[in-house]
Amino acid sequence: DHLEINAEEISPKIMDSLAYFYDEPFSDPSMIPTFLLSQSVKNYCTVVLGGDGADELFGGYPSQLRAMRVHSMLRNIPISFRGLVSQILLEVLPVDLRGYSLAHSLGVDFNNISSSFNPLFYKKEMKYLLGDLFARDIENLDQKKIEPPLKPKTYLNMLNMSDFKSFLTEDVLVKIDRSSMAHSLEVRSPFLSKEIIEFAFTRVPDQLKIHQGRKKIILKLLGKKILPKKFIFERKQGFSFPIDQLLLQDDWSEYFAEKILN
């Protein structure tokens, strides 16, 4: 009752198709399985339903859960003190140290929607890659100020809004749109209807999104009425792809060596 696609059988030439249809730099490896999934589904139908927006609206990301835990531990410590400690630690610690992200988290401003727990690059990395001048110019590009149409009432609401206005629109929906349209497949996203968006941001309390280590609670309460329990309470797997393993295969390594060296 399902179709399996073996990653080891995927040709590296799929990258040529992705480059053509995306037509811009895109760093999400799940673009590959999304493209292949759209290609396979088109053999059976032309319109499908997608679940995009559910994680952003109802608290489904592990990063949101981690941020909530850090917030509960640090919210009563003044940002001026936390920021100073964070700045000192980030200067002396190596970026690849396990605790570096925690040192960064100390300086997160819980009142600023653009203050990120998961920056694309840390300041030290940008300075190393770009030099002082350019690093200062683009320092906040991945933490751009997000002006929400609805003012977040709680910290979780702020996290949801940040993911909704950045990751969803600039990664997830781009990936879905390019992959599906490449195969003339229409993907409809019920969670992105105006009514559900307003409902999630204005009427659903935090306790029905993330609470006591559980995520997306309200959707699971609804889902367990019609879906088997194993689907409701299974650990979130995401849509990852073994790109590191593929690059070890001869055909993939030769493909990228040729593209990069030429």
Question: Locations of the language-model features?
Answer:
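Short beta->alpha junction loops/turns
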Residues: 7-8, 54, 216
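Adenosyl-5′-phosphate
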Residues: 30, 47-49, 97-262
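A conserved beta-strand->alpha-helix junction
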Residues: 1-21, 136-142
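A conditional alpha-helix N-cap/helix-loop micro-motif detector
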Residues: 8, 30-31
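Active-site phosphate/pyrophosphate- and oxyanion-stabilizing loops and adjacent acidic/basic residues
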Residues: 16, 35, 39, 198, ...
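Short, polar/flexible loop-turn hinges at active-site or ligand-entry regions and domain interfaces
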Residues: 24-27, 72-76, 206-210
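Active-site adenylate/phosphate-handling loop in enzymes that bind or generate adenylated species
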Residues: 11, 36-96, 167, 176-196
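Short low-complexity, flexible loop/linker segments enriched in glycine and/or proline
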Residues: 17-21, 42, 64-66, 246-248
